[in-house]
Amino acid sequence: MTAQLPEKVSDIFNPADWRVVEGFEDFTDITYHRQVERDENGEIVRDLPTVRIAFDRPEVRNAFRPHTVDELYRALDHARMTSNVGTVLLTGNGPSAKDGGWAFCSGGDQRIRGRDGYHYASGDTAESIDPARAGRLHILEVQRLIRTMPKVVIALVSGWAAGGGHSLHVVADLTIASEEYGKFKQTDATVGSFDAGYGSALLARQVGQKFAREIFFIAKEYDAQRMYE
């Protein structure tokens, strides 16, 4: 295997520990890497049983659009079907080049949200929406895949986990959050939507009915310590 290192996609990403997964080099909204062991010359000796899937839109706090979700599902499904992968690390690249902010995922990109869901668009504004394609809410399919795949999915939260991003951390098997930068917020009340998928049901099961309602109804920010408690 080659000694060439992948691009450094995040300040907390060590290229020497990873390689890009073959066949997924065309991703634009996420990155997909396989953990590797290298020898003293930097040559890859073997693949390790961990993959890293990361949102790669730090300039918008790693918000997802339909294209992002398409790529996320492809990567997760590939990891599910790869027999020598045991663990999936789900995280967000960063920080933002604009302001240095960190995010795991801030949920759906509100700029391309319509009445029927989030729309495919050629750009980042409502004017670039493709009117020939229906809106999508298929992040719920990703939630279902995470809950049913026979792999351990760990959410690594190094910044904001908000809205749909908060729900992704909830459906993951484990969450490891930065004590300094990890922030959690369910923004449904702010943007006028509701996660009727696994996110709300599992949150109530994990933290109790009353606290889950507080998280959803009040849209309050919680730090990593409070969410741990």
Language-model features: where?
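Charged catalytic carboxylate motif
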Residues: H67-E71, H138, L145
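Crotonase-fold acyl-CoA enzyme core
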Residues: R144-E229
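Short, charged helix-to-loop "capping" segments that act as catalytic/coupling loops
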Residues: D47-L48, S83, L89-G107, D173-A189
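Short, flexible helix/strand-to-coil boundary loops that buttress conserved ligand/catalytic motifs
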Residues: F64-R65, G108, G117, D188, ...
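Conserved CoA-thioester-binding segment of acyl-CoA-metabolizing enzymes
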Residues: T2-P95
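Glycine-rich acyl-CoA binding loop
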Residues: R61, R65, G135, S158, ...
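Glycine- (often His-adjacent) and acidic-residue-rich active-site loop
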Residues: V60, G92-E141, G192
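Hydrophobic/aromatic residues within transmembrane alpha-helices
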Residues: I53, L90, D109, L168-H169, ...
